[in-house]
Amino acid sequence: MPPRFDVLIPFLEHLGLRLLEIGGGRARVGFDPKPEHLNSWKAIHGGGVMTVLDAALSSACRSLDEGCIGATTVELKVNFIAAARGPVIAEGRAQRAGRSLLFAEGELRDGAGAVLAKATGTFKLVYPQARGE
């Protein structure tokens, strides 16, 4: 059975995102777009591309601390390289952890491995209220 996001994220479930791999500051997220996820050119809408990348990067950051319950996005930058058509996989990698923020990067690839988009992001881990946050 593939890993789960470990928390209920209704928006990601609604889109059908799948957490394929997570651990050690890395995560892979799969997305099989439906017609309602496409733009007028029959490619995945840019907001969908950003969502898949955000899920991969934030999951990579979250994997570094088992005590956190999530990672909130502070900043996300995406460079769109080519139209995303068909099933895609986003890979995120945590790059550096500061005192309160984590930095990550990643790519969105098609089934052949071609890079469709690149992203960098800044994230803040979220902890249960019991930790005083």
Provide a role label for each language-model segment.
Residues 1-133:
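Terminal targeting signals and extreme-terminal segments of soluble enzymes
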